[in-house]
Amino acid sequence: MSGSINKDPRDVIIAPVVSEKSYGLIDEGKYTFLVDPRSNKSEIKQAVERIFNVDVASVNTLNRSGKRRRTRFGWGQRKSTKRAIVTLKDGTIDIFGGPLA
């Protein structure tokens, strides 16, 4: 647990997920981020609270395995990722930089 205190929050949160589904969840106060696969829920919660100055109610995580793809040289695989869906107690995060439509 002491390692998570010294970890830089920008090493935990990689990028916001830009998709129709994640954009629709913003109305419910849920934000989706790509996160470091080695990070846990408490590290993700601390990172979001530090970066965006908001209170986090809960964090749900999911591991997505990379798709198997055919290449010229045989079979390859896309990178596996970890996503976190963060629910806020109150407040908003301006991650897309504009007003919601």
UniProtKB/Swiss-Prot annotation:
InterPro entries: Nucleotide-bd_a/b_plait_sf (IPR012677), Ribosomal_uL23-like (IPR013025), Ribosomal_uL23/eL15/eS24_sf (IPR012678). Transmembrane segments: none annotated. It comes from the Bacteria. GO terms for molecular function: rRNA binding; structural constituent of ribosome. Pfam families: Ribosomal_L23. The keyword Ligase does not apply. GO terms for biological process: translation. Gene3D superfamilies: 3.30.70.330. NCBIfam families: PRK05738.2-4, PRK05738.2-5. Belongs to the universal ribosomal protein uL23 family. One of the early assembly proteins it binds 23S rRNA. One of the proteins that surrounds the polypeptide exit tunnel on the outside of the ribosome. Forms the main docking site for trigger factor binding to the ribosome. This is Large ribosomal subunit protein uL23.
